[in-house]
Every structure is written in structure tokens, then in C-alpha cells.
Amino acid sequence: MKVLFATGEAFPFVKTGGLGDVSYSLPKTLKQKENVDIRVILPKYSKISNELLKDARHLGHKEIWVAHHNEYVGIEEVELEGVIYYFVDNERYFKRPNVYGEFDDCERFLFFCKAVVETMDITKFKPDIIHCNDWQSALIPIYLKERGIYDVKTIFTIHNLRFQGFFFNNVIEDLLEIDRAKYFQEDGLKYYDMISFLKGGVVYSDYITTVSDSYAEEIKTQELGEGIHGLFQKYDYKLSGIVNGIDKISYPLSKKPHKILKADLQKKLGLDVEEDTPLIVIITRLDRQKGLDYIVEKFDEMMSLGIQFILLGTGEKRYEHFFAYQEYLHKGQVCSYIGFNQELSTEIYAGADIFLMPSVFEPCGLSQMIAMRYGCIPVVRETGGLKDTVKPYNEYTGEGDGFGFKQANADDMIKTLKYAIKMYHRPNVWQEIIKNAKKRDNSWDKPAKRYKELYQRLIEG
């Protein structure tokens, strides 16, 4: 079984979000645990450190026709932890300050999609399946069909439907160079007067997955379908969810007791050292999607509950300013770390008591699973992957490894948080919840097995 995993990013080479984590951990697990010959292909961004590419081997180069001109494409190969990574080299498109968000992203990533299809002769790797991820690789199924390559199956995984790769429709002829009459239609790339790259993956791939079972159902609704819920209803027969996992090796556990880790964290971040005060944390991109408006609305009430609060994240300035001001108002009780620090994030997971994640929607989410590994109990809104990975605690049965609320509003969030704090002040109960959280298997083993089964099913037809 040969699989080519096409992605816009992969840790440790380049990462802007959860896709980078998945593109590292899933192929590694499929290779090591399921014996799948899987290789990863991504752009060779100038942001990738020379140290990571020092052993890169140049496999070859050629010119491909893109946007009405010939364009150089080179392929370089690096092996990491048993997985081969191919890098699509072109300085015109990928020697940029940003991974995404450039003025010509349309041309950059249609080039990438074409290059994936056109360089199999260079890699000498003919896959049974190309596994595409998000809009950056969503045109690959189209270019395979345009080239008449029908013996390579395609899977398209949606990591976040909100990002669809919208562009003006004139690029169909000007850049994509495909038949407008054939592809600019509702059951094609058309999205109102624009085109959506992501729709290419949805319509033309052989199978669609999302990153959790619940999210696969949610994108069929008007509320969370981002304008194409009808398309997912139509293609329901080839759609399913497979919840992500976490790479446990990336999150090593400390041998120190929690109370020491908590005290160390409090000292490091300038909080009063208070062993019995519930320490509530959020580690997130500061974006409305993450439910931050609920926290802003109820922040004064939260602080009245006798808690400490840590924020680690960066994003919208209005949130950055709000949380920075709260640190000023609540010296010794609030720390707002605007930015991101991997080492600090691990210390926060290990030293905190409650992880707050009230997302408006969440395709999967990794933070809640990382928190549970460290015994930091998640309080989440029951949506998408949060619903699938956190079982709300039931004090009558003793079952559950976190706390959840169903409706997307601030009142339900604060009500659930109060209940979690109430349980926190019952030490025996709280230790039972921690025990439940730590024993939950959030590894990549089960998801990798499900993907292998899906690959096998598609190959067998």
C-alpha cells in the first residue's frame, strides 16, 4: 500500500496550526504502527530552517506548464523518523515571508497541486492513494482527472471548513487552465461569484474525511456548513469523520508531583503561590471561533469565584488588549502571555487544574487532549471534536473525564465552570476525574488504523 500525503505544512519543518501536527504524527504512526508506505509532500518554504534540510537530497527537476508559462519545479527528499518527505522547490512561489496569506496564493497552491501530480516521474513513487489536506492541496483530484490518471485514488481531509481558498472566478481560465463550463458550476468549484479550491476536493475526490465524527455531521448543517452544507448532504455517502490523536512523545510527563509543578508555574508567571486555588488556563489562537467573547463577557464573574487565570496565545488585538488589561487589574491572579512558547505551553498544561475551551465550533482540537494527558481537566463546549474526546463528568456514576456545555453562550459556560470548580474543591472526586482523564487513549493508534482501513477499502474498489 503506497500513500502520498499532500499538505501545506508539516511539523517540524513548518507549522501554522493543527494541520502541521497532523501531517507529522499521522504519517509517522501509519508508517511505524500500520506498515503503510506513506510519504509526505509539501512546499519547500524559505521559512524552513537550513538545519532541517541539511541532509536533503535533490531528486531532480523539470518544467511544468502553469498559468500560461513554463515554471521550474525541483524535488528534494528528506527522511525523518522513518518517513520520507518530498519538498516542492520553486523560489518564485515559496521564497516568501509567509506560508499563507500572500497576494498570489491562488497561483502558488495551484502550482503546488500540479507539481504533486507532475513530479511522480521524479520521485519514482507511484501511490495507490493521494491523501489531500485542506484547500491548499484540494485541486489535486482535478489535475489527476485532467491528466487521465484514474488508477490513483484520492482522499480529501477537511481540517477546518472555514478556510476554503476563495478566489475570483476568472482564475479558472487565467491560472487553473481548466474548462470553465465544466468546473464553474454549483457541483464544482463555484461559490457564489467566486471559486472555492476546497470544493474541488469535496466534489472530485473519491472520499472525504473530517477530523472528528461530530464535525462530519455538523458540516451538513446550515449553522456550520459555511455555505456548502448542501454539498455535504449530497456527498454524505463518501463522507465520514476520524478523530485526530496526539503524539505522546511530543508531550513528555514530569515525575514531579502536580503541586510542585503548579507552584513552579505560579512563580514563573508572577502569580501568587496558592496551592488550593483553582488555576484555570487557556492556550489558543485569539479568535472569535474559540469562544473568547464568552470569557470576556463573564471574566469579572470568573474572577469572583476565587480562581487564578493564565492565557497563552496571540491573535486579534481586541482580545490581546483585553487580557493584558486584566493582568494589570488582577496582579498576582492573572497572567496574560501574548505570544506562543512551546516549552511554556507544556509547563502550563502540567501545572494547571482546569483547561477552558468554550469554542463556538471546533473541528477536532488538540489542546483538550494534551491537557487530559497531564491531568488538566477540560471544560469545553460540546461541539465537533470536543464532543467526541471529552466525556462530561457524572457525579452519580463517577464516570467522565471533563465538563461540557451544549449551547454556545456565556451563561452556560460560566454555569459549567462553576460546577467544575465545585468538584475541584472535593479532592477525592477531583482525583477520580484526573485519573479518568489520564487513562483515556488519545494516541494516534486508533485513527491510524481507521485510515489504513479506509485506504484499503478504496484501493480494493
Swiss-Prot record:
Keyword set includes Glycosyltransferase: yes
One family name in Pfam for this protein: Glycos_transf_1
Top-level class of the enzyme under EC nomenclature: transferase
One GO term (biological process): glycogen biosynthetic process
Keywords per UniProt: Glycogen biosynthesis, Glycosyltransferase, Transferase
E.C. no: 2.4.1.21
Residues noted as binding ADP-alpha-D-glucose in the record, renumbered to the chain: K15
GO MF assignments: alpha-1,4-glucan glucosyltransferase (ADP-glucose donor) activity; alpha-1,4-glucan glucosyltransferase (UDP-glucose donor) activity
Pathway where this protein functions: Glycan biosynthesis; glycogen biosynthesis
InterPro entries on file: Glyco_trans_1, GS/SS, Starch_synth_cat_dom
Keyword Repeat: no
Family: Belongs to the glycosyltransferase 1 family. Bacterial/plant glycogen synthase subfamily.
Protein name as catalogued: Glycogen synthase
